């Protein structure tokens, strides 16, 4: 009777699917309301003007406009510059 498990082939062989996290819309891109901006675990980016935060910390646009990344009180924030203002600038 063998006392080795044959290179432990039966105990290996599992891997989880990637979570597809990260920034989905970058600075300067135009978005419509409801579009996902950042998928994240925890608040690496905080919601700014016209940006909402979901239960899984996903940031999404509350209004149409252009994406803008910035900082406020030492935190990275994501803002949406409204489309009307973005068209004039």
Swiss-Prot record:
Positions of the region Disordered? 1-25
Name the SUPFAM superfamilies for this protein.
Answer: Ribosomal L27 protein-like (SSF110324)
Pfam name, any one: Ribosomal_L27
Iron: is it a keyword of this entry? no
* Cellular-component GO terms for this entry: cytosolic large ribosomal subunit
Write one Gene Ontology MF term: structural constituent of ribosome
Composition skew (Polar residues), residue ranges: 7-19
Superkingdom, natural source: Bacteria
Which cysteines are cross-linked by disulfides? none
Listed A to Z, the keywords are: Ribonucleoprotein, Ribosomal protein
Provide the GO biological process annotations: translation
- Membership in a protein family: Belongs to the bacterial ribosomal protein bL27 family.
Protein name stated in the entry = Large ribosomal subunit protein bL27
